[in-house]
Amino acid sequence: GIENVVVTSQDPHAFLKDFEGYFDCVILDAPCSGSGMTRKKEKMEDDWSWEKVEKLVPIQKDLIELAYKLVKKNGLISYSTCSYAKQEDEQIVCYLMENHEVELLNIPDDGSLKGIEGIGRRYIPGLYKGEGQYQCILKKLGDSIENDFQPIEYKRTIKGFDNFYAVKY
């Protein structure tokens, strides 16, 4: 497995103090209205609303800004949602592109559809295995703080996980 990956659902604002400009890549699966989950939810029409979209857009903008601050120069941001609403997808990416130096990277055609105005990819059930998704990959070009982070050469065992991967017969 990959040893230098952390998966968290903690408030990302907590990372800024110690890790601004630190990460090679931030994968942001943003909270969204879930409009791409139509096959999974029996009563999607009861769960989805424009009000929900409008409530989530400021959160998504805040999170993509944080992702931008956390990646180092030339680092990557993968932004995804399980929504089809352009307000939660392409418009969030455009917001970042209008406010920061980023490069929109091409995602190869893998059966998905190009996003609106060619921004990112849309994964549609029936055309792609899985639920509905949106994804975009951006490369940070500018506005990066200089840091003196050095790689740490040690193995740390988290209490309770020391035998997590041990094979037992």
Predicted segments, located by residue:
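S-adenosylmethionine
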Residues: 1-169
